[in-house]
Amino acid sequence: MEQLTLRERESIVRARLGLTSNHAAAYAARDVDVDVIAAYPITPQTPTVEKIAEFVANGEIRAEYIPVESEHSAMSALIGASAAGARTFTATSSQGLFYMYELLYIASGLRLPIVMAIASRAASAPICIHGDYQDVMSMRDTGWIMIIASSAQEVYDSIIMAYRIAEDQRVLLPIAVAFDGFLMSHTTEPVELYHEEYVRKFTPKNLDRLILDSSRPITMGAMAVPDWYYEIKYQVIHAMNNSIEVIGDIHREFNNSFGRSYGFVESYMLEDAEEVVVTYGGIWGDVKRGVRMARKDGIKAGALRIRLLRPFPARDIVMSLSNAKTVIVLDRAVSPGATVDGPLALEIATALKLEGIDARVISAIHGLGQRTVYARDVYEVLKSSHHDGIQESRVYLGVREYGSG
């Protein structure tokens, strides 16, 4: 694949700013020229919609901003707007996501290309405004394509790509782009913003889909009896499964257009790795550092980051982990009562088993409620695994057990 020259890259980049992931999401929504934004502020997502409201007020974007009274209303408004042909955007977190939950299925069932940013946050109770991925993991079965970013630049780029993916005729599904609450949503990082004309050339508005139009009346969202419900739902499943090819195509086109390469997964030192840490989100930098620390101790360690959660890129994951002896899955969410407690660990274990790969899978829960996890913690779990110090298939890193004071 031909790479952009330095001069070509410089001509594409409009500005280099220090941005939080919240603001990176807002700039992406501005640059793709969204038509309708409906949102209700909730920590730690609030700065995203505040910044978009500022863009609208300043005339930087010609869009309708709807300050609704709840997240349920926000998604309802976007469903109506998207059904009428508008390009739409919202953002939320935690209880806000749960409040719009019934609408998530409606958005995917109606095949509406809505894009939503999620600043991930712990689920109440107890009330906790800090970050983990319990909210994000709760929507895996709603029919939304799901991307988890690990940097503010990736948030910006992923939202731009999300519109191309969602609006593709082969897909027509809503997309959620998630990132760590506070650890990313409120942390300033360098971000390159692209000139609007390049972004809008990459994301042309595609109205080649059925919309509510009084000049061409259609019925949308009608009741489906058993004779047809199954087939309609199967179309959503079919679109989701086939979207992985579209996502790959758009990744390659984005690289050709902007000089940034993304995949379904990201690997680190996997060539000869026997002990592999699998994770997602903003902890990726600490995981890589922990792997380097383990390598200095002679442990053949590596790491894999899952960027695309839905559709689940099982083939890429299996290829990446085919030589691993132990796979430690770091989950910042929990599925109580499941076969293994980590939502991602359950998916990884299933993918490996179906392909006959006999690696040991350890579900390692970490950082619930944003409990801090350091690179040394990753190193310690790798060292313990290497020396057969982990006997259980599930571990909780850094938790004070009941009765321990």
Give the label of every model feature segment.
Residues 1-138, 143-144, 160, 180, ...:
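Thiamine diphosphate
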Residues 299-326, 333:
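Core nucleotide-handling region used for phosphoryl-transfer chemistry
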